[in-house]
Amino acid sequence: MNYNKAMPNIDKTPRFSILILNWRSEQHLPGCLNALQAQSFKDFEILLLDNGGQEAIPNTLIDEYPDLQLSLTRSEKNLGFAQGNNLIAKQARGEYLVLLNADAFLEPNWLSIIQDATLAYPEHFFASRLLKANEPEKIDGEWHVYHVSGLAWRHMHNQPQSQATNESKEVFGACAAAAVYPRVAFEAVGGFDEDFFAYMEDIDLDFRLQLAGYPCLYVPEAIAYHVGSASSAPRSDFAVFHGHRNLPWVFIKNMPGLLFWCLAPFHVMVNLAYLIMAPFMGKGKVMARAKWASLKGLGDAFKKRWRIQKDRKASVGDIAKLLNWNPFAPLIKRKF
């Protein structure tokens, strides 16, 4: 069900469609919307999904923000991050999709800076600097790093802001807590893979966009403050299950050509290492369930791989340059 507010110039295509999925993070939503209301660049719409049938967001919320072009959709079931964002992305009219967590708060010039970046780099998608909302002197993440082993992480996570990367550069991908995608690119690659439900789905999207010929640009001046883990604890059974079930699927679907066959043994070893270590961290059962579920999905993953690689535009060399090859990086990964 949709609750829409009539706005002036509703037929005008907005520059940005901002997609916000709410799942147990409604306490942060006013701060998120207040930050959007304060944006210096105003050409955007907001599509908000109240996910999971909790009706945590009152219908009156729309009336509390008369200056925002805001649409509220409700889902009776928890669709997960992937399917939930795909649902509201289909309603979007903007030229660019902004994926924004409900617990992420943009600085007032964030959209203005991103607008300038889209004009200068129209074929790119964009990563922005995330700082910890409760410790703004620390970095929550700058961009996604993808290692040759198949592991992935946020660059500079938990490092002091004084060590932040201050130059714009092409990177592997963007953390979808505050990321920007050309709508045509998002649609061209099919949006998020809904089989993922949550965790690793934005890294999978990064990879597919890169393979399709859409590079990612890190824009350090665009700063957002991110609470993080507002909807699920980072080491919860839910997070461990989905993250480790989805880990091999990303690798199998996306790693191109010769790189796949050269790196697959290392990826297998990484998965076996997690199975061995998990019992010592109290996660043995959930890790075993995750890897078994991943194995059961390998057939579908290879079918998707065939379709993705058939349409690949980026060369194997292009992708190789985006990967992290440092053998020690997974051990001290935050700075790599």
Identify the residue ranges that each predicted region occupies.
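Active-site-adjacent helix/loop segment of glycosyltransferases
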Residues: 212, 216-306, 317-322, 326-329
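Conserved donor NDP-sugar-binding/catalytic core segment of glycosyltransferases
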Residues: 105-147, 151
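Glycine-rich, basic loop-to-helix element that forms the pyrophosphate-binding segment
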Residues: 75-92, 102
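Short aromatic/hydrophobic "clamp" motif used to bind/position activated sugar donors
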Residues: 97
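Short, acidic, metal-binding catalytic loop of nucleotide-sugar glycosyltransferases
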Residues: 34-43
